[in-house]
Amino acid sequence: METPIAEELAKKQKSISVAEFFEKNRQILGFDSAPRSLITTVKEAVDNALDACEEAGILPDILVQVERTGPDYVTVIIEDNGPGIVREQIPKVFAKLLYGSRFHALKQSRGQQGIGISAAVLYAQMTAGRHTKILSKTSPTAPAHYYELMINTSTNEPDILVDEVRDWFRPHGTQIELEMRAAYVKGRRQSIYEYLKATAIVNPHARITLIDPDGNEEVFERATDKMPEPAEEILPHPEGIELGTLMKMLHYTERQKLAPFLRYSFCKIGLLTAEEICKAAGLDPEIDPHALGRHEARKLIEAFEKVKIMAPPTDCLSPIGEDLIYRGLEKETTVDFIATSTRKPAVYSGNPFVVEVGMAYGGNLPKEEKISIMRFANRVPLLYQQGGCVTTHAVEDIKWKQYGLNQPGGGIPVGPVILLIHVASINVPFTSESKDAIADIPVIKEEIDLAIKEVARKLKHYLSKQSNLKKRREKEIIITKVLPKLAAKVAHVLEKDVPDINPVVAKIMGNLLVHRVIKNNGDGTVDVAIKVKNFGTSAYSFRVHEMLPCKVSGAKPEPKVVTMGNDYDYVWDISASAGSSKVLSYKIESASEEELQKLPQLIVEGIEEELVTGAKAFKGV
């Protein structure tokens, strides 16, 4: 009797392991080209290093080294000073997909699924046929454990080739070495260098060193010794929970009554709120949750929407903060203006999130190109699929002309700008498993829009101020060309010395006048008065610096003194309201006429140079 076709087909059907699936679909995880495969590998290892260091409270010190081992092959070594990994866990952490500690944790973290670094190990063994080398140490008194591993794709279990103890100079940390088919590229936005530079900006507490295949070393120094606030794990929030998820929670709970189940399974539900939800759902608070079916679960979800429940807590998030975004941009860019904004936390589908934006303008940034958008999710740079990301869509939808930037044909504006956008959440809604772009969630897009507009308004104010200062500068240039000639002619007619025109220029311009008046007492001593007069309509707070090669006496008011080699910097902190005058005085015990003529120009710190007459000026930070 002939075997039915259905039975023949059934013999061919079998399950596959997750490792086999990703072995044949590696592009899903970001291993679709030689350059990108290397970036993805470095990204996964650096993410793990940063997460481990932060959880242990250690300031990260990370080394990334890339070596060419053939025309199409590289070896990449990533080393960190983190807490290390205990011996028993090393094979599973690096050679078993979907193995990790963060998948069920509701808090902000870089990695979550437990796929990333194992996928890199899988890619290395597929393309180079090589095992991965791992060295890890947990304390100065413990030995370092060395493994050589591969992944058994049939079982998704680690194959251990070498397991031994070694000496290692580090007190604690982890090193991973992989050889793979990949390409190291330079001069592109999508490169190892740009990825690490972007990582350094949003992780200013980290020190990252890159050694490229040519042996060149680039160090991204940390800008702060302050660790980020640790993110706390929270319970799920009832807003946006799906029916199947709730049914699973009801089935597996250890609680025997519905009200306690609600209270201890969700955040922001207390005893009174739990009873109110039960009442709204028409369910007995004493009923056993295990007895509830699909119909009752749907009633609970409807009750969640009816009852007012507080928003989820936000201590599960760890935003960078405006000050550290500023420092990160300042450290890695050369610009004239930086503005930052951190929004208040918001919620989508029960998931807390926060949006942060930084904007850098001017300096050596290209003026005729589209602005550079730096996208981040949970402090991780997003280098690919910019056009499919909600951050880009938010940028394109803003009318940039009203903020001082050209936007020919709409879309991304043109100008010397870096726009940094960071979305932090316990569950960032990526568009794919490769985590390249954030999905178009309306509330997230709205928060991005508001944060961008906040820094854009600051840019508009800065550009307006710069335009006014430029006009003042042009006016002052004309005045300082005409007045000296006029003063010289009048002095010649009257047969007098040419007067100092600075007070006249300051009065015409409405500037702050700062000038030095010297009186030689004839006994070898000199009285010096620094006269300050505010001819403007605004109050100013600033510092006056007097750099001298000698010590002074009798200074009033008493200045702060900074020794700089053989010179002394005398510093006065001054506040001058509109129309007010100040006098700073001191005495020099002995000085010749020649020395007095060589006194350096006074310096005013804290005011633009266009607003000061008679002294050098700089705005400062």
UniProtKB/Swiss-Prot annotation:
InterPro entries documented for this protein: HATPase_C_sf (IPR036890), Ribosomal_Su5_D2-typ_SF (IPR020568), Ribosomal_uS13-like_H2TH (IPR010979), Ribsml_uS5_D2-typ_fold_subgr (IPR014721), Top6b_C (IPR040494), TopoVI_B (IPR005734), TopoVI_B_transducer (IPR015320)
NCBIfam families: PRK04184.1, top6b
GO terms under biological process: DNA topological change
SUPFAM superfamilies: ATPase domain of HSP90 chaperone/DNA topoisomerase II/histidine kinase, Ribosomal protein S5 domain 2-like, S13-like H2TH domain
Entry EC number(s): 5.6.2.2
Keyword annotations: ATP-binding, DNA-binding, Isomerase, Nucleotide-binding, Topoisomerase
Protein's recorded name: Type 2 DNA topoisomerase 6 subunit B
Molecular function GO labels: ATP binding; DNA binding; DNA topoisomerase type II (double strand cut, ATP-hydrolyzing) activity
HAMAP family attached to this UniProt entry: Top6B
Enzymatic reactions: ATP-dependent breakage, passage and rejoining of double-stranded DNA
Superkingdom to which the source organism belongs: Archaea
Protein's job: Relaxes both positive and negative superturns and exhibits a strong decatenase activity.
Cited SMART domains: HATPase_c
Summary of subunit composition and partner proteins: Homodimer. Heterotetramer of two Top6A and two Top6B chains.
Family affiliation: Belongs to the TOP6B family.
